[in-house]
């Protein structure tokens, strides 16, 4: 968070961060070929809205469909998913969201470089630590939140 003053006049506070786009991801992942940079898939979800920021969402939709239709307790099915999704990225993302107590957890970004796995990006964490009267994990495992998150809830 940065406090901005211009000519002595307060203009508010701003978040200093890089723009999440194909160039940011290319630099982070070491992608240098322009064709590969243009082929980076970046998907976004804000609340219930989903959109493709760059590239295509076809592979992601196929993966999501596979997860819905198949038993992931089957080792072959689970392997299919882990071949396409960087599970460490998912777990790290979930851990950060929970530890930071982010109540705006439905604003999500995932990306994939050509030939790579889908990875989660930590994004939009301005709503962290707003519910200091509750532990973050308490918030995430309550039934309503679990349903919103898309976790299996019975």
Residue ranges and their predicted role:
Residues 1-154:
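Catalytic-core segments of enzymes that bind and process phosphorylated/nucleotide-bearing substrates
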């Amino acid at each position: 968070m940065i406090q901005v003053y211009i000519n002595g006049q307060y203009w508010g506070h701003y978040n200093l961060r890089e723009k999440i786009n194909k160039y940011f991801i290319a630099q982070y992942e070491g992608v240098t070929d322009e064709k590969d940079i243009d082929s980076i898939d970046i998907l976004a979800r804000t609340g219930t809205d989903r959109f493709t920021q760059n590239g295509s969402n076809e592979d992601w939709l196929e993966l999501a469909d596979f997860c819905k239709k198949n038993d992931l307790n089957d080792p072959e099915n689970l392997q299919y998913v882990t071949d396409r999704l960087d599970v460490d990225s998912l777990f790290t993302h979930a851990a950060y969201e929970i530890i930071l107590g982010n109540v705006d957890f439905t604003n999500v970004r995932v990306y994939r470089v050509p030939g790579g796995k889908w990875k989660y990006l930590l994004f939009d964490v301005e709503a962290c630590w707003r519910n200091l009267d509750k532990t973050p994990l308490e918030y995430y495992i309550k039934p309503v939140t679990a349903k919103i998150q898309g976790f299996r809830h019975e």
